[in-house]
Amino acid sequence: MDTMIDIKGLSIDELERFLLGKGKERYRARQIFKWLYQRGATSFAEMTDLAKELRRDLEETARISTLSPEALEISRDGTRKYLFRLDDGCSVESVLIPEEDRNTLCISSQVGCAMACEFCLTGTFRLTRNLTTAEIVNQVCAVQRDVPVRNIVFMGMGEPLANLDNVIRALQIMLHDDGLQFSTRRITVSTAGLVPEMERLGRSVTVNLAVSLNATTDELRDRIMPINRKYPLAVLLDACRRFPLPGRRKITIEYVLLGGVNDTLDDAKRLVRLLSDIPSKINLIPFNEHEGCSFRSPSQDAIDRFHRYLLDKHFTVITRSSRGADISAACGQLKGKLDALKPSGAGKQIEVSDSTNEVT
């Protein structure tokens, strides 16, 4: 059994305590963080401003994990889907969405998902396990070696707030000045609506929050999102009102438009009433059809009508284009399996590594 500490699984405070336990100076933690996250060091030998004695000690008691993509698929629209094989054979996917002025990376927090949302392909796979802090952070590090990343969204495989300890620790690494140096404005954590964990997230770190709402009545949300039976709309929306928002930031409300299910004008009217006193902006996401799911994409008329009504009521609203759908990288299509990356005429597949164990 591997008893060595994965150094990339530690927050700066935990790394300081680890070093203090060895009789070393606290400031060494900041030096190590910079080597890991700003210089991309993969061995302690590279950390030349550390004393040789400390480097030898670290080599004997700690390790630096890495991830390399086992496969990469590139969409016609430039979206890049990375498949990472973890050290226990499990796999997860991350998606890079390119824009003119920024790249947004969508990362995973779990292998599979227990939320069982009816419209989400990931939800059809049972939850296998939580990702470790290092596995979350290493998705960002791996993609940054390939292309620059400006924004991070926790909207990949899994429910981030169901893995809150590791997600918070990963966020602390991403936000730290000696870590990955992301701005709090550039990171968004999405949730299906785990209310107690929303409150703890708000107390622990300052990041943007996205709530996957998708219905305007408890009857419908109970059916398509089972978590609603535990935390119904009134409870969830009250938690949104209490969530600490710095400055003039708003909660992002994600609303997947399901054809003939939740895309009517009456749905739009109820949504406006529900959000009337919550600082929010709305992302409309036309459903991406996938095999084995009975839901259908909404008509363009229904999308336009819904969008216009929200605009007329002075909401900030964006209808998201379906990026990466030709390589099953669009919202709700991630499944973390090699069979998701079979070559097709639509996307280009690039095999990056034949290894089945990418964590070292």
From Swiss-Prot:
The active site is at residues 93, 331. Its EC number is 2.1.1.192. [4Fe-4S] cluster binds at residues 113, 117, 120. GO terms for molecular function: 4 iron, 4 sulfur cluster binding; metal ion binding; rRNA (adenine(2503)-C2-)-methyltransferase activity; rRNA binding; tRNA (adenine(37)-C2)-methyltransferase activity; tRNA binding. Disulfide bonds join 106-331. It catalyses: adenosine(2503) in 23S rRNA + 2 reduced [2Fe-2S]-[ferredoxin] + 2 S-adenosyl-L-methionine = 2-methyladenosine(2503) in 23S rRNA + 5'-deoxyadenosine + L-methionine + 2 oxidized [2Fe-2S]-[ferredoxin] + S-adenosyl-L-homocysteine; adenosine(37) in tRNA + 2 reduced [2Fe-2S]-[ferredoxin] + 2 S-adenosyl-L-methionine = 2-methyladenosine(37) in tRNA + 5'-deoxyadenosine + L-methionine + 2 oxidized [2Fe-2S]-[ferredoxin] + S-adenosyl-L-homocysteine. It is found in: Cytoplasm. The keyword Cytoplasm applies. Keywords: 4Fe-4S, Cytoplasm, Disulfide bond, Iron, Iron-sulfur, Metal-binding, Methyltransferase, rRNA processing, S-adenosyl-L-methionine, Transferase, tRNA processing. Its main location: cytoplasm. GO terms for biological process: rRNA base methylation; tRNA methylation. Signal peptide: none annotated. Binds 1 [4Fe-4S] cluster. The cluster is coordinated with 3 cysteines and an exchangeable S-adenosyl-L-methionine. PROSITE patterns: RADICAL_SAM (PS51918). Residues 99-326 form the Radical SAM core domain. Belongs to the radical SAM superfamily. RlmN family. Reaction proceeds by a ping-pong mechanism involving intermediate methylation of a conserved cysteine residue. NCBIfam families: rRNA_mod_RlmN. Specifically methylates position 2 of adenine 2503 in 23S rRNA and position 2 of adenine 37 in tRNAs. m2A2503 modification seems to play a crucial role in the proofreading step occurring at the peptidyl transferase center and thus would serve to optimize ribosomal fidelity. This is Dual-specificity RNA methyltransferase RlmN. It comes from Geobacter sulfurreducens (strain ATCC 51573 / DSM 12127 / PCA). The gene is rlmN.
